[in-house]
Amino acid sequence: MKIFSEQLVEEARVACHVADLATATIGEVLLVAQYLETKTGIPFIRMDQGSPGLPANHFGVEAEKAALERGVGSQYPPAAGVPELKEAASQFIKAFIDIDITPRACIPTTGSVAASFGAFIAATQRKTGQNRVLFIDPGFPIQKSQLRVLGIEWREFDIFPYRGQALRAKLEAELADGTIAAIVYSNPNNPAWICLEEEELHIIGQLATKYDAIVLEDLAYFCMDYRRDLGHPCQPPFVPTVARYTDNYVLMLSSSKIFSYAGQRMALACVSDALFDRQFPALAQRYHDTGVFGSTFIASILYMITSGCTASTQYGYAEMLRLAAEGKINFVEDTREYERRAHRMKRIFTAHGFHVVYNHDVTRPVGDGFFFTLGYPGMTGGELLKELLYYGVSSISLGTTGSQQQGIRACVSRMKPELYEVLDQRMRAFHEDHGDGREEERVKSERVKSEK
């Protein structure tokens, strides 16, 4: 039995100015869910927005307060970032990834969204004719929205059928015309929670070097592949990264998930030292500067977007990174609650006819973490998103992430202990209304009609 009527959901769609629920953005789904909650007082199971569901790390809070009390709020922050944060970032990267990036090339940004926005500009303007972006999907929809704002063309492909060595031929075909300036993916992946394995990262790195494309590696969910014993500073296993296989990279690290510091909008764009020092005549001509990638990226691009990052927050982030690198903060254990939530939620959904869409990496099953993907027999992703709204569950369609698979993205961050039973009841009702042969009959009926 539906909780929200079709009429009421349609009222919410119109009131929130959503063109089509099947292709609704994260923000649009959020507005519809909030409208229905406010209108009825009935709580939603919120699986839409990937906002942290844990308290902010208190070490960061205290360090930020101390910085404000020292008076840092009265001065503009350096465009390249405060030295304490740059040093801590370099130390953190060495401790957990085991690669060397000097502090000068670790650049604070106002969230990873600002990092990618600036990196898209720098990457696509550095060489004439090499001005497109390639997405290894599924991915974060906002990054393509950024390219729409910038007027940058892109190509994309769903990695689902191209895992392992199959990635090489596909990637080579996409890069062969020489127009791709940047390659983008997240690892672990938003939305699928798949993790690229070493052979895949090796392929990406080799081909990025061959075709001189810059890899933008989004590490927002750093060390959150809980299948591996990550998070021990200066001890293997280290975080997998393309940085072992190419010098053409920008690593995007965020405070939002690993330290639950999303409200302060703080991240890092960590550029390889080799790329940081490369000189590009096209950048020099456009910006009337030296054309050196790192300095142009900082002073001529990022500074024009945000004019630096909040000084006090930089000190808070620096403290969290420093303590983590010294082994005094175990941020992996702090975030492991997401693994427990995902495991429990998956059990509920799969007990009621759902299946996990992206369920395997190359050599093992996908783990439990911040996101997972769900499909239901006979339904497209857009149809499933819309149907779940009637049962008080909000999500986003995989179609909006560049996926070619049918299903939805589920985020676990807003799940609360008291809602598991509610979720179970609602999904039982959903399956009673859609499963047990009903969907098979509908598909069969539609097939017969089409044959006529």
Where are these regions (language model features)?
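A non-catalytic, amphipathic alpha-helix used as a structural packing/dimerization or gating element
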Residues: 28, 84, 88, 300, ...
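Conserved glycine-rich beta-strand-loop-beta hairpin in the small C-terminal domain of fold type I
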Residues: 311-314, 318, 331-346, 356-375
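Conserved core of the PLP fold type I
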Residues: 69-211, 216, 222-246, 250
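N-terminal small-domain helix-loop-helix segment of the aminotransferase-like
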Residues: 2-9, 15-114, 165, 321-328, ...
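Short hydrophobic/aromatic beta-strand micro-patches
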Residues: 270, 373-375, 411-413
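PLP-dependent enzyme catalytic core of the Aspartate aminotransferase-like
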Residues: 2, 91, 95, 99-101, ...
